[in-house]
């Protein structure tokens, strides 16, 4: 049985994954995998370059390129993504299937994705745990973590599916409001999943 963990920005899903790791559970991180695959997959490199342009990757003289790793031009990619929703969907259509395949190949039973439902990767798991937190707590966490304004934090939250919608689709919820006992909630869910 495969389990997906999701939650909006600032909910603390990465911290929950850290607590799972302390219990011996390895969680596949979809965001990290996407970044790794964009650096290492020849097919992704070619398709992204065809879509975005030759500026997609930086031309470096480092040995890493010869070792099969390229440096993504984050500024160029961000500019392309923010230019239109269609651009973002086009990049997703290239990257998401590669991540899906990589997860399947990994043999891992747990995965973490901020966009589990939006990306469709929820189809690869049997049950979903959502990590939630009150919006004010999330805003505060994002502002502190990323040193950004309140307005920017609210904007980032607004780009994702509403927390309530994700909650309704999930099988389990972990409330990470700074008050509820996270360890107890995790242990309760793990006991049910045994």
List the model feature ranges, each with a label:
Residues 97-104, 111-145:
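ATP-dependent NMP and nucleoside kinases share a basic, alpha-helical "lid"
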Residues 12, 31, 91, 110, ...:
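Residue-level signal for inorganic ion chemistry
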Residues 99-103, 123-124, 144, 148-193:
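Small-molecule kinase domains that catalyze NTP-dependent phosphoryl transfer to phosphate-bearing small molecules
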Residues 22-24, 104-109, 169-171:
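Short glycine/proline-enriched coil/turn segments at helix->beta-strand junctions
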Residues 8, 51, 80, 94, ...:
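Amphipathic alpha-helical segments that mediate coupling or scaffolding at interfaces
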Residues 23, 45-49, 135-140, 150, ...:
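An amphipathic alpha-helix signature
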Residues 1-67, 187, 192-194:
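Glycine-rich phosphate-binding loop of ATP-dependent small-molecule kinases
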Residues 35-108:
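ATP-dependent small-molecule kinase phosphotransfer cores
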């Amino acid at each position: 049985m495969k389990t997906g963990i999701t939650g909006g920005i600032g909910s603390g899903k990465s911290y929950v994954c850290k607590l799972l790791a302390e219990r011996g559970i390895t969680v596949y991180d979809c965001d990290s995998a996407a970044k790794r695959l964009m650096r290492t997959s020849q097919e992704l490199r070619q398709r992204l370059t065809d879509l975005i342009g030759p500026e997609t990757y930086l031309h470096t003289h480092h040995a890493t390129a010869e070792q099969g790793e390229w440096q993504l031009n984050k500024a160029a990619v961000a500019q392309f993504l923010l230019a239109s929703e269609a651009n973002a969907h086009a990049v997703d259509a290239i990257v998401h299937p590669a991540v899906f395949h990589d997860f399947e190949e990994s043999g891992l039973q747990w995965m973490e994705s901020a966009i589990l439902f939006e990306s469709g990767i929820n189809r690869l798991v049997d049950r979903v745990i959502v990590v939630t937190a009150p919006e004010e707590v999330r805003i505060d966490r994002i502002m502190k973590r990323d040193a950004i304004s309140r307005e920017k934090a609210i904007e980032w939250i607004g780009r994702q599916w509403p927390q309530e919608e994700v909650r309704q689709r999930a099988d389990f919820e972990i409330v990470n409001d700074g008050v509820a006992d996270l360890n107890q909630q995790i242990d309760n869910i793990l006991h049910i999943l045994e």
